[in-house]
Amino acid sequence: MTLPMIMSCGMYYSVPGLRDLCHDVKSRNDDAFTDAAEWLSRVIDKYDLEGYSVIPIPNHSGRAEYTLDILKRLRRLRSIRICDILVGAAHATQYDAKKAGTRLSLNDYGFELRGDIPFNRAILFDNVIGSGNTYFSAMKTISFKTSLLTLAQTHPTAYYANQWSKFE
């Protein structure tokens, strides 16, 4: 079974409660991690993830923090392999860059792999996909196309597929 480009709980602005959940996750609300894992478990139940490693994408600190916390909660609910091997450079948040009238480039993340991906089968995980830059930068770092598991997306999947074609 081929996985879709994006596996999400829904659209950020239109699914009731999803935007608030994403904000609570970024605030490191412990209950939000559990709720996020429950939402994500319903998404991954639709797919066969056997043999895949789920890689948490680091936040602006350069480390996977809340993304890793959510995946650990998800692993309590579903059998998933977590591979915390992606690190990055500390950088501005997308939100702060947007407020400043700029946009982060793919190079601003400074992602590096610190280990091997078992079977070269990976799924990236991030809280929200907005512009797609974080996802695309992480995908370029691992050197092969991969799906993204995310709580929410701000655009339809076709938008991201079109954006990705510009980087190939």
Locate the predicted segments by residue.
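Hydrophobic anchor at the start of a short beta-strand
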Residues: Y52, I80-I82, A122, K145-S147
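Active-site-facing substrate-recognition patch
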Residues: M1-Y52, V87-F119, S131, T154-T157, ...
